[in-house]
Each structure stands twice: as C-alpha cells, then as structure tokens.
C-alpha cells in the first residue's frame, strides 16, 4: 500500500500501519479501576428506588428465582423500603453527597497522585448506581488502556460483593468488540499492610478515648447462612481478619468479638448478630464498648448510621455506659498505602 494511504497508529502499543481515514487509536496504557458497592444519587424516593432495585435485583445478592423475586421486590419491597432507606441516608448525607462516593473518589485521587502517570491511569466506579462500571471501563479504554485491573474494595471475599463486581465487569466487556486485557484483584483480608493499617487505626482511636473498653466488637456485614453453607469463604475470612488484628494488638483471646450486621429478610444469616449482641453485652458486664467495622474500607450507611447511631442507641438503652465507633480507613494515608500495595501487586508485569 502506498505511504500516502497509511499512517502509523498512536504510540505506545503500535500494531502497524492503518488506513489514513482510520479513527485515531490510542493504546499501551494500563488502567486501574477502584470499585466499591454503590450509593443512590440522592435521598429522595425515586433515587432510592432506582438504587435499591438495581442492588436487590443482583442474583449474587438475592439467590432466589428472579421471576418470583421480582414480583416481591417490585411490589411491596420497593413500595415501602425506599422511604425508610432514604430517611437513613439523610442522616449521613453531606453537602458533597454520599460519604461512600466521596471517600472512594478521594481514594482514587490520592492513588493517582502517588502512582498515576501518562502510562498508568486511575479511576473509580460503583457496582450499583453511579458512576457505573461500564461507563468507567469505556472511559479508560477510550483513554488508551488496553490493560485494565479492577480492584474490588472489599477486604473479605464474598460472592455477594467481589464476585458481583467481576460479573458486572465482564458483562460490560460483552459489548466491546475490541476488549482490553483484564485482571481482577484478590481479597486482602489477611494482607500485612491491611492488618497493620487496621490495627494502627484501632490503637490510635483507643489512645484518644476517655474510657477503657471492656471489649472490642468487630462487626462485619452479614450474608445469608445458606451462602456460607454453599462454600462462600466470607465467614472464614472475617474471623481471620479479627484474629490477625487481635494478635497484632496483643489482645486476650476473648477481647475481640466477631459479629455480623445488616441482615435482610426472614432467613438465617451469619451469627452472632451485631444488634442482638449490642443488646446483650451490658447484662454480661460489658458496659464500655468500642466497635470496629473491618469489612468496610470506607465509611458508609452501615457504619455511620447503623453502627454509630442505631448501634449506640441499642447498646446504651440496654445498660451500656460508653460507646465509640472507630472510623474506617477512608482516604487516610494508611488507606492509600493499602490500595497502593494491592495495585502494585496486581499490576505486576503491566506497570513498573
């Protein structure tokens, strides 16, 4: 073909000459996409309904036949639950929006400032709501990323969370003719950098308290027990995180209590339940309590409202005297250390 009819592809990532009328193709970059659970666009009824419909329609979250479940979900549940959930979100909503969205955005910005470059691009998405995984994958690809590493920001693996992110990631790829190479990151429930960060945040919080806790409650988001029975490793990974943190801080074997929160529906979930434990502890002599939420790298509805507000009310009404919740790592330098460690490990061979 004559030289006048061809031109080179944009470098890096040269794949040879292209016709002169071919669209510009940018390649050779590596993308990192941080993904957390998601958040509604607002606290109003319809924003909440859209978000809950997407979230609760995920077959990874609710493992029942979808035709039957959708009749229940789109009927009574989404008639009443959006208003209730909206009231809860209003308690924690900021001028900048959802705390989870804000912290995830800041994490991406801080990570970009540390390790981002023209070759390594960093962005974030939400598994439910906005910004969506498909939109951010398309953006990274348009920016020249032919290799993308997706980082689910869940310390402990569960099919309800990590696997759902992977499902939605690869579902988005189905619509791409020219797909980027993909990697998904493993859980980090026992990674030393995460255990160090979590232990240090707890230690610092305890030092600043005006009381000495009788026990520390490690509250993780729950999953139905049936999922555990089918082989979900989440329960085991939660207990391992608790054990490693307790060992790091030199706690006695029974000082840390592992519980599970946020159960939904009539079925049995992982136990012991956080709310029932909070109600029972004062009668067992535990009057001063500190609560940690190791399943969440960022503060969200479950930590700011369910634990910090409802949890304190439950504990104090049952006879507790002092109660404090350790903030999540959020966008602290320690949080970025954890995420950077994951990214460097998972992009080995792609990014130097």
Predicted segments with their positions:
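Active-site-proximal alpha-helix that buttresses catalytic centers in soluble enzyme cores
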Residues: 2-352
């Amino acid at each position: 073909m004559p030289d006048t009819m061809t031109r080179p592809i944009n470098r890096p990532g040269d794949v040879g000459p292209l016709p002169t009328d071919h669209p510009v193709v940018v390649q050779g970059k590596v993308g990192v996409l941080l993904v957390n659970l998601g958040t509604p666009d607002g606290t109003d009824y319809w924003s909440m309904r859209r978000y809950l419909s997407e979230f609760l329609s995920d077959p990874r979250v609710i493992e029942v036949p979808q035709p039957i479940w959708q009749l229940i979900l789109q009927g009574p549940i989404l008639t009443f639950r959006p208003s209730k959930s909206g009231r809860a979100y209003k308690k924690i909503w900021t001028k900048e929006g959802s705390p989870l969205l804000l912290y995830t955005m800041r994490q991406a910005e801080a990570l970009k400032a540390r390790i981002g470059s023209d070759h390594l691009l960093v962005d974030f998405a939400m598994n439910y709501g906005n910004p969506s995984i498909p939109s951010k994958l398309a953006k990274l690809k348009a920016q020249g990323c032919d290799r993308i590493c997706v980082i689910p920001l869940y310390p402990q693996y569960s099919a309800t969370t990590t696997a759902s992110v992977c499902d939605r990631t690869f579902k988005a790829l189905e619509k791409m003719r020219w797909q980027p190479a993909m990697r998904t990151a493993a859980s980090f429930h026992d990674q030393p950098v995460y255990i160090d960060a979590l232990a240090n945040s707890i230690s610092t919080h305890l030092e600043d308290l005006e009381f000495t806790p009788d026990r520390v409650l490690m509250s993780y988001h729950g999953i139905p027990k049936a999922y555990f029975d089918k082989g979900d490793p989440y329960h085991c990974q939660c207990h391992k995180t608790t054990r490693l943190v307790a060992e790091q801080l030199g706690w006695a074997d029974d000082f840390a209590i592992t519980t599970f929160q946020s159960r939904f529906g009539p079925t049995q979930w992982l136990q012991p339940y956080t709310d029932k434990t909070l109600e029972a502890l004062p009668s067992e002599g535990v009057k001063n309590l500190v609560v940690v939420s190791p399943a969440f790298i960022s503060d969200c509805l479950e930590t700011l409202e369910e634990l910090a507000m409802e949890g304190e009310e439950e504990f104090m009404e049952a006879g507790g005297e002092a109660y404090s919740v350790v903030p999540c790592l959020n966008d602290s330098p320690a949080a970025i250390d954890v995420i950077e460690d994951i990214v460097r490990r998972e992009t080995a061979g792609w990014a130097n």
